[in-house]
Structures are given as structure tokens and as C-alpha cells.
Amino acid sequence: MANSRNKSSNELAVHGAQQAIDQMKYEIASEFGVTLGPDTTARANGSVGGEITKRLVQMAEQQLGGGRSKSLS
């Protein structure tokens, strides 16, 4: 029997974080020269999404490690 408390994988774990994620998305898209929209290629959108993930992981590592993280580049 499925657990009705399971969250969708697309739901944010922190309520109110959507605005910060959206801001990060548009900042990264601008840095990469990507105009987000329906005509943007999956590859371009994926590069933005991948960079968001990379930066969020780096931020989490810094918090967990007391600010000591390696560069992901």
C-alpha cells in the first residue's frame, strides 16, 4: 500500500524557498547567456539546472562542514 505522506520529488523541502531558487535560476541563466523560455533547448535548460544543483550542493557542504568545501570546478 502506498504511503499517502510521500512527497513529490518536485516539492521543495523548505517552504518559502521557491523565490530564492527562481532568483538563482535566472542569475545562472544570465551568467550562461541563456534566455529561459519555451524556445530554449533542453541542453541549455539542463546546463542551468545542473549549475543550480552544483551550487546548492556546495552551499550545503559549506554549512555542514563549517565553511570548508572544495571548489567543484
Swiss-Prot record:
The record marks 27-28 as: Cleavage. Disulfide bonds: none annotated. Pfam families: SASP (PF00269). Keywords: DNA-binding, Sporulation. InterPro entries: SASP_alpha/beta-type (IPR001448), SASP_alpha/beta-type_CS (IPR018126), SASP_DNA-binding (IPR050847), SASP_sf_alpha/beta (IPR038300). The keyword Methyltransferase does not apply. One of its GO terms (biological process) is DNA topological change. PROSITE patterns: SASP_1 (PS00304), SASP_2 (PS00684). It comes from the Bacteria. One of its GO terms (molecular function) is double-stranded DNA binding. Belongs to the alpha/beta-type SASP family. PANTHER family: SMALL, ACID-SOLUBLE SPORE PROTEIN A. SASP are degraded in the first minutes of spore germination and provide amino acids for both new protein synthesis and metabolism. SASP are bound to spore DNA. They are double-stranded DNA-binding proteins that cause DNA to change to an a-like conformation. They protect the DNA backbone from chemical and enzymatic cleavage and are thus involved in dormant spore's high resistance to UV light. This is Small, acid-soluble spore protein C5.
